[in-house]
Amino acid sequence: MENWTGRPWLYLLLLLSLPQLCLDQEVLSGHSLQTPTEEGQGPEGVWGPWVQWASCSQPCGVGVQRRSRTCQLPTVQLHPSLPLPPRPPRHPEALLPRGQGPRPQTSPETLPLYRTQSRGRGGPLRGPASHLGREETQEIRAARRSRLRDPIKPGMFGYGRVPFALPLHRNRRHPRSPPRSELSLISSRGEEAIPSPTPRAEPFSANGSPQTELPPTELSVHTPSPQAEPLSPETAQTEVAPRTRPAPLRHHPRAQASGTEPPSPTHSLGEGGFFRASPQPRRPSSQGWASPQVAGRRPDPFPSVPRGRGQQGQGPWGTGGTPHGPRLEPDPQHPGAWLPLLSNGPHASSLWSLFAPSSPIPRCSGESEQLRACSQAPCPPEQPDPRALQCAAFNSQEFMGQLYQWEPFTEVQGSQRCELNCRPRGFRFYVRHTEKVQDGTLCQPGAPDICVAGRCLSPGCDGILGSGRRPDGCGVCGGDDSTCRLVSGNLTDRGGPLGYQKILWIPAGALRLQIAQLRPSSNYLALRGPGGRSIINGNWAVDPPGSYRAGGTVFRYNRPPREEGKGESLSAEGPTTQPVDVYMIFQEENPGVFYQYVISSPPPILENPTPEPPVPQLQPEILRVEPPLAPAPRPARTPGTLQRQVRIPQMPAPPHPRTPLGSPAAYWKRVGHSACSASCGKGVWRPIFLCISRESGEELDERSCAAGARPPASPEPCHGTPCPPYWEAGEWTSCSRSCGPGTQHRQLQCRQEFGGGGSSVPPERCGHLPRPNITQSCQLRLCGHWEVGSPWSQCSVRCGRGQRSRQVRCVGNNGDEVSEQECASGPPQPPSREACDMGPCTTAWFHSDWSSKCSAECGTGIQRRSVVCLGSGAALGPGQGEAGAGTGQSCPTGSRPPDMRACSLGPCERTWRWYTGPWGECSSECGSGTQRRDIICVSKLGTEFNVTSPSNCSHLPRPPALQPCQGQACQDRWFSTPWSPCSRSCQGGTQTREVQCLSTNQTLSTRCPPQLRPSRKRPCNSQPCSQRPDDQCKDSSPHCPLVVQARLCVYPYYTATCCRSCAHVLERSPQDPS
């Protein structure tokens, strides 16, 4: 029945829309009245002022401060002294200065001002109805974005309701004041509404010229959106003059089942014959917002107050609920007319704006929030750092069924530095408890970087975290070296009188200073700070080289030695925070001073700067109100006075929904989805698409829609209720024993599946479930056993106590020998060695034969033999004859046979022999030379040797005492004369000689090595003069004269044998020139 009652009204609405279709063709053929806009973009806005910095995030130590700003639409100034212009266009381009025109677009197509009811998405800003067209794919939306023209409906762009609907005819004589949530138009004092005989809207292009004349319109009633703030009881109903009964919208039963049907408001006839629209909860629909419309007239959406980004979701009047645009009040002369006052109540100013539901959100380039580090008072020493406190917060929470004492784990890099990684005390693993630490936590100890929102931010030179600004070459924060200026020169004036003379002034902000004398001089550089305070070389005192702080920086004073050929110098990195003066203490003429520094210079001021384009000053448009009766003529006004007539701007009605040329008559619409694949936790479902008619919105056969344009029914995640908790057991550990019975362990935790996946929950949630075992017995294989591999061996001795052994091994189940550790758990190992007793031993002395040689060639000598004590089992070693070690027995010492005896080969006879000494050095260091040795005749009688006269050995052949020798190849070398006699016979004297360098042919040369030159002088006769041989120094051989004669006193043997004779030789030797 509902379909039959609504169909006539639909036909009537189509007939009334035909004139508008013709008008649309004219508008499209002429100049465009629409704002070229791209989806997802708004007009250019301006940043509001920064709010004050918030308080520090930490009570002590280092924290973070925040501040923000909002993006606002450009304000429009009101100049009462200028005449009111015609109504400006509703596009952001209309705010540009005259002559500039709109911005260039990448596409010649433009978006319509109104949105057709067949689309669910109407523009760059989305309100409660913004998701009506989400079922369309991105490809379809992009293809039809520039072709469809949709009407702008209340609540479409973020406001959610229309705060005011103005009736053009009122039957009440006593108008009531509108509620706070309704927008009121109030006229100024002493001025009345002047209706226009022919209401017209005059949209203007960028250059201000009118383009198209629009037909008169009336306002319609729209119920508020459920997303907006609730209406008060007195504002929950809105009165409108009844013209015709609105046609109810038709919806498909399947769409209703899927929850996409927007319920229509209920209408009742109230007092005075007015309709009352009661607000009902609304849902988005592909057919737009259902609102009662007056038959024969098209609704005129009311302009809204622009809102910034920070005002979204605060209702039509911001936070306070009070309109900041012009208020509407009834005109006393015309009860049905409403005039606006240019007063904003508590916020009265020269700004002018109207509440428009189609006002877009402005877009601004740049950052809307800034953060900086803040330093509070140092935290108490006993208080842990913030990261330790955050880890300690998990001490009372079980992890893997156990409580731990958590401490920070900071041995991480990169993005993990801002994660809360904690390590249980005494364990060798760490856990990431949260993905980000609290804002203001240091990324790592001792570093300036701070964690904010899980990111490690470094402070820039401006103090803002993450700004990335660095000082340029001249110290400008975030500069590009464009303002850097190098100041340098040479001071070559000869100088004035002696003393301090100012030579250079260094301004504040100077960097990389270099001041140096060109050459060494007796002059000194001096430095003075503000007020003439001496810093370097002041008060006629010369300071040592070093570092000195002045002007906010550190100056390095250098005074090199004069040998380097450099003068004094002063240098500093800067920047200087105060100006400093450089002086010279003149003591001679100026050798020249070089100086240079870098400073940031401000941009040059042009003599005739180009004026900046003025901010567009738009006057408030004249808003015309339709009178309740016949229009009255406009009263004349005095020339030169400002007309403050106010009227409501008339807007073209939205075109009737129709299918654009070239678009299919039907489209695929998402009406729901299949059941979730999981009854609990996370699952998937598939969307359901139906073929819908664009004209009627009814379901069509699938063949009416293009098969290629059907969106893919891709699976989408769905979330059900949480699943029941369950015990989750980990993997069993390895068996505690490699063989034999052992135990295994595993971890057990209570888990529960939610929509986002499974996670650990407290074990109490699984208390009603049987708890699985966490330990179990295990046996990998049987252990090995000990096996005796051989019998006992023979005893190590033949008699007495000894040792015997056998082979014992660990054998596995397969009979192979295995490690002894596998038998450790079984019976003890059998012994592999033990003691043995072979009975008492019998002992006796055994000896060998006497040696065949006598120890002496003549006279009495000694013969030897071996004597041992032997038992019946083994022989005793040396020294065991009496003790019998190892046998427990011993041989009788009294019966031990002797092991030595005397022998004689007859009496000895004296013999003589020649004895030769060692060869001496070669007489020539190079070339051919000779070697000498000593030869003496020695008599032997038994073991006694005596040196005798060489005549006693004359019967024997004498060995040679001289032989030739060959040295190295001859080179120039040093030659010396014999030493001269000692200058003193005792108590020290000197000897001298001549030294010359001779070549191989015995001529003087200078090519001898100087380091090998022999000494020309030496000491001699250093003994005391009273020294005499003592009585104990005697000659013990009668042949001492021969020893002296043969020069054998150099040998220790002869020195001891012939002590007195050799002592006299030593007394005379220093005087011997040879």
From Swiss-Prot:
Keywords, sorted A to Z: Apoptosis, Extracellular matrix, Glycoprotein, Repeat, Secreted, Signal
Bias type Polar residues, positions: 103-119, 206-226
Glycosylated residues (UniProt): 490, 773
Biased composition regions of type Gly residues, renumbered to the chain: 310-323
Region spans: Disordered: 77-342
Chain ranges of the PLAC domain: 1029-1066
Gene Ontology CC entries for this record: collagen-containing extracellular matrix; endoplasmic reticulum lumen; extracellular region; interstitial matrix
Ranges for domain TSP type-1: 48-93, 723-782, 783-842, 845-909, 910-969, 970-1026
A biological process term (GO) from this entry: positive regulation of apoptotic process
GO molecular function: identical protein binding; protease binding
Main location: secreted
Illness: Ectopia lentis 2, isolated, autosomal recessive: An ocular abnormality characterized by partial or complete displacement of the lens from its space resulting from defective zonule formation. Ectopia lentis et pupillae: An ocular abnormality characterized by displacement of the lenses and the pupils, associated with other ocular anomalies, but without systemic manifestations. The condition is usually bilateral, with the lenses and pupils displaced in opposite directions.
Protein name in the entry: ADAMTS-like protein 4
